[in-house]
């Protein structure tokens, strides 16, 4: 059960959206060419394409989700492609408020760079989350879903979900891209997917939960439920949302859920320069602090195995990650995507990259979890792209549920738990 189900009494699914934004390190503002590892097409579901109207993307996304999640009724629009605060405030308002006008959408997740926010934009997002922007906006969880004004108008059957193709084992909550892989990605040659997602069905399915409350957010109560192995994820909840700060059935919210998710990628400035990010870690710290100060749910994304970073460096950066006022963190292993500058760099010097095998990666992830703050929600521990975008699949034919079972067993074998080695 998910973080949102615990808070709102039902599962809430993400819909990946493309609003046509760009990045300042692509257009010459702070650099050219973008991040050296990035090909955004590798992270797009089929329904989310630039130039398509947002409401059309939402409708197609709901239909896309329908088979897998037939009981889901509410969605978060996930602005994922490129930097989704890189534009004028007026442009941002148009995009966000169009998305929030859909009767089955209950909130917004904004993926962006730390150098693409300012006080004005964050104040607007704070007003959006605080109910000061969309007057009369309402959504009802767990009840009939019918309310006045902006409220939900569809029946329970109409707002549901499914993933297709290779994404059959994935949750859109993971938010990392290619959950809309084409049928041709499922060919015999391509079935060696080299990566996985820890999604909203993660360790809670196998855990005995004990609940711990965190109150870092000024506008919400965040309750962690720790499994027997101690992973703090956003996928653990009560059944009806009425306990631990969740909402009872039929409860109405008068303001949308707003989450800001920063691509930080590394805590090392030398790495950020090497991959052409165009900002330093101090910029990321300032952005996270400015966002959290406004009571906004704040998340971050990190890549494990960027060139020049050793295993020891990646473990050492856990202290820096824990020092940030984050609610959630996503990790994924570096994947060498075809046609990127990173592909050329890897071909020239593979020894500069830490690319562990699957067995070593499990222990590595556990070592990271043990060093992180115990109240951080871990939304993802690995990532995946369609096989057609990569040349190698070093982990072979391994699916998500298998990886999750492996990770859970390994943590139990080691007696590991998130935060065990964390020291304030």
Please state what every model-predicted region is.
Residues 136-142, 153, 282-342, 359-382:
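Conserved C-terminal portion of the radical SAM core fold
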Residues 1-2, 11-13, 157, 335-424:
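Auxiliary Fe-S-binding modules of radical SAM enzymes
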Residues 96-97, 310-327, 384-405:
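Short, electropositive alpha-helical surface patch
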Residues 107-110, 118-144, 149, 153, ...:
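Radical SAM/AdoMet-radical enzyme domain recognition
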Residues 146-213, 217-244:
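Long, intrinsically disordered low-complexity tandem-repeat segments
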Residues 89-97, 118-129, 314:
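Distinct, well-ordered alpha-helical segments
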Residues 1-34, 40-54, 62-73:
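N-terminal [4Fe-4S]-dependent radical SAM core
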Residues 41-61, 68-89, 104-117, 132-135, ...:
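Core AdoMet radical
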């Amino acid at each position: 059960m998910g973080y949102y189900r615990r808070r709102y009494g039902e599962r809430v699914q993400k819909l990946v959206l493309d609003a046509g934004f760009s990045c300042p390190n692509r257009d010459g503002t702070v650099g050219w060419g973008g991040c050296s590892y990035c090909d955004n097409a590798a992270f797009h579901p089929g329904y989310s394409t630039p130039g398509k109207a947002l409401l059309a993307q939402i409708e197609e996304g709901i239909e896309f989700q329908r088979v897998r999640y037939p009981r889901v009724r509410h969605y978060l629009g996930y602005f994922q492609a490129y930097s989704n605060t890189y534009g004028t405030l007026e442009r941002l308002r148009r995009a966000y408020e169009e998305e929030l006008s859909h009767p089955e959408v209950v909130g917004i997740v904004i993926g962006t760079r730390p150098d693409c926010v300012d006080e004005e934009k964050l104040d607007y997002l704070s007003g959006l989350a605080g109910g000061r922007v969309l007057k009369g906006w309402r959504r009802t969880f767990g009840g009939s879903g019918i309310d006045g004004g902006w409220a939900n108008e569809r029946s329970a059957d109409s707002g549901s979900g499914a993933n297709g193709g290779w994404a059959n084992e994935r949750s859109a909550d993971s938010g990392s891209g290619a959950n809309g892989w084409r049928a041709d990605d499922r060919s015999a040659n391509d079935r060696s997917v080299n990566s996985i997602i820890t999604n909203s069905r993660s360790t809670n399915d196998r855990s005995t939960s004990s609940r711990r409350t965190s109150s870092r957010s000024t506008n919400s109560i965040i309750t962690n439920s720790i499994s027997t192995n101690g992973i703090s994820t956003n996928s653990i909840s009560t059944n009806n949302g009425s306990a631990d700060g969740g909402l009872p059935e039929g409860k109405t919210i008068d303001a949308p859920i707003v989450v800001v998710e920063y691509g930080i990628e590394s805590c090392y400035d030398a790495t950020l320069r090497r991959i052409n990010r165009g900002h330093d870690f101090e910029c990321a710290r300032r952005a996270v602090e400015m966002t959290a100060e406004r009571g906004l749910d704040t998340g971050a994304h990190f890549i494990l195995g960027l060139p020049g970073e050793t295993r020891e460096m990646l473990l050492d950066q856990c202290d820096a990650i824990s020092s940030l006022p984050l609610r959630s963190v996503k990790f994924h292993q570096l994947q060498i995507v075809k046609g990127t500058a990173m592909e050329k760099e890897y071909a020239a010097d593979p020894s500069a990259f830490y690319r562990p095998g699957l067995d070593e990666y499990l222990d590595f992830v556990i070592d990271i979890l043990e060093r992180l703050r115990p109240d951080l929600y871990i939304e993802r521990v690995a990532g995946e792209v369609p096989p057609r975008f990569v040349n190698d699949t070093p982990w072979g034919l391994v699916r998500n549920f298998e990886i999750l079972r492996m990770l859970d067993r390994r943590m139990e074998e080691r007696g590991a738990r998130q935060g065990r080695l964390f020291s304030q």
